[in-house]
């Protein structure tokens, strides 16, 4: 009996051991819906538009040579009117550095980031803008998830709060080209988008798929309010 007990402890220790070296970050990571994934399936730099996933979530990709890409698709709860949430899609890419203390700094290419904000109870059009937000992760850890049996990435934000866990879906990562994709001289400015991304960004559908009462949506309200400060509006 004691043998089985200690064997169980050993297996648990192996399943939950984690590491936090720069090489462990390499790959494309996504939250449990596995629908939001970086790369050409989320943002089209040629058409300069978003492509709406079937479910909400976040995704980060890290290359071995120091480049990263991120994709966000979230519903933002409205405390004053729970039946009237906002929707936000965000994309940016750039370079990252893993510091000696285990923290990570992400520096985006300022002219390339994009955000689409939809507030259907205020307007039938979404607002499409350039987006630029540097990020700092206090720490990260990569382990084998004991339930799903796949590699899992746990990240703590700059203030120590945990992000939603992400799971490895591609290695090498699935990313768009890492150079500047939208030079400022040729990129579009803030604009109104009828129906979101070519008619696909449907916040009402989003609410029916992922209920606004989900506590995860309320958690992201605070994150949204923080990152909103990073939006750069630019001339039409």
UniProtKB/Swiss-Prot annotation:
Protein name: Protein rot1
UniProt signal peptide: 1-22
Compartments reported by the entry: Endoplasmic reticulum membrane
Main location: endoplasmic reticulum
Bilayer topology annotation: Single-pass type I membrane protein
Keyword line: Endoplasmic reticulum, Glycoprotein, Membrane, Signal, Transmembrane, Transmembrane helix
UniProt GO MF annotations: unfolded protein binding
Residues in the Lumenal compartment per record: 23-217
Residue ranges, annotated region (Disordered): 178-197
Highest taxon of the lineage: Eukaryota
Transmembrane segments: 218-234
Gene, per the UniProt record: rot1
Family: Belongs to the ROT1 family.
Lineage: Eukaryota, Fungi, Dikarya, Ascomycota, Pezizomycotina
GO biological process, one term: 'de novo' protein folding
A Pfam family the protein falls into: Rot1
Organism (species): Aspergillus niger (strain ATCC MYA-4892 / CBS 513.88 / FGSC A1513)
Biased composition (Polar residues): 178-187
Glycosylation sites: 54, 132
Function: Required for normal levels of the cell wall 1,6-beta-glucan. Involved in a protein folding machinery chaperoning proteins acting in various physiological processes including cell wall synthesis and lysis of autophagic bodies.
Cytoplasmic topological domain: 235-236
GO cellular component, one term: endoplasmic reticulum membrane
């Amino acid at each position: 009996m004691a043998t089985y007990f200690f064997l169980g402890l050993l297996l648990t220790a192996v399943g939950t051991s984690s590491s936090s070296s720069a090489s462990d970050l390499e790959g494309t990571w996504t939250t449990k819906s596995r629908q939001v994934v970086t790369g050409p399936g989320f943002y089209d730099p040629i058409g300069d538009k978003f492509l709406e996933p079937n479910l909400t979530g976040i995704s980060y990709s890290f290359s071995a040579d120091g480049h990263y890409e991120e994709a966000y698709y979230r519903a933002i709860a409205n405390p004053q009117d729970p039946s009237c949430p906002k929707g936000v899609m965000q994309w940016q890419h750039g370079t990252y550095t893993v510091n000696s203390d285990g923290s990570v700094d992400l520096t985006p290419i300022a002219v390339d980031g994009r955000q689409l904000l939809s507030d259907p109870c205020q307007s039938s059009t979404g607002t499409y803008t350039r987006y630029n937000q540097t990020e700092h992760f206090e720490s990260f850890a990569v382990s084998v998830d004991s339930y799903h049996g796949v590699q899992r990435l746990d990240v703590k934000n700059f203030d120590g709060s945990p992000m939603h866990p992400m799971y490895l879906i591609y290695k090498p990562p699935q990313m768009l080209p890492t150079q500047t994709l939208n030079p400022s001289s040729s990129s579009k400015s803030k604009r109104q988008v009828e129906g979101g991304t070519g008619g696909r960004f449907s916040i009402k559908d989003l609410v029916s798929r992922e209920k606004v009462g989900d506590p995860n949506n309320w958690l992201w309200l605070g994150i949204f309010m923080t990152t909103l400060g990073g939006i750069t509006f630019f001339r039409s």
